[in-house]
């Protein structure tokens, strides 16, 4: 259902003299957020050291840098409408913590998502083990530069899908 809606809202963009179909800007942004969130909060990705890939944070940062106030409001509203508030909040706050927020768009998006449980942003799930973990280190920069992020996790309970 969600994928169908995203595809139906797709737009045609011109780049390098070529027209391509792509997701609407706010949907594209949220798609990036959802992927980053999934990888950063799923234990196997942490084990493979693919949970905090720099290029994904840079992509978000560059999009935030170019985002207007009205577009930031649209992203927050769309995230809320699609049930992607947590994913969006996580990805935006992490990108802002790593690179800053010169345009103010990141802060604007975060303010537009007041219902997100920020304590839950540090949870990690292990679907195969049916366990839930939580980061003991909440500082994004420290986590990013930690050579073994598995050591920053503590088991907190059973994960139920």
Model-derived segments and spans:
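Conserved NTP-donor binding/palm subdomain of two-metal-ion nucleotidyltransferases/polymerases, i.e.
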Residues: 1-161
């Amino acid at each position: 259902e969600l994928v169908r809606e995203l595809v139906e809202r797709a737009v045609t963009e011109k780049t390098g003299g070529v027209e391509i179909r792509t997701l609407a800007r706010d949907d594209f942004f949220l798609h990036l957020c959802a992927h980053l969130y999934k990888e950063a909060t799923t234990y196997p990705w942490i084990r493979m050291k693919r949970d905090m890939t720099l290029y994904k944070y840079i992509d978000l940062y560059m999009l935030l840098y170019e985002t207007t106030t009205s577009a930031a409001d649209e992203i927050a509203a769309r995230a809320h409408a699609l049930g992607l508030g947590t994913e969006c909040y996580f990805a935006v706050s992490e990108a802002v913590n790593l690179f800053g927020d010169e345009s103010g768009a990141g802060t604007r998006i975060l303010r537009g998502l007041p219902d997100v449980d920020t304590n839950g942003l540090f949870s990690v799930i292990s679907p195969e083990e049916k366990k839930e973990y939580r980061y003991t280190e909440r500082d994004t920069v420290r986590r990013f530069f930690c050579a073994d992020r598995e050591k920053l996790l503590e088991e907190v309970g059973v994960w139920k899908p």
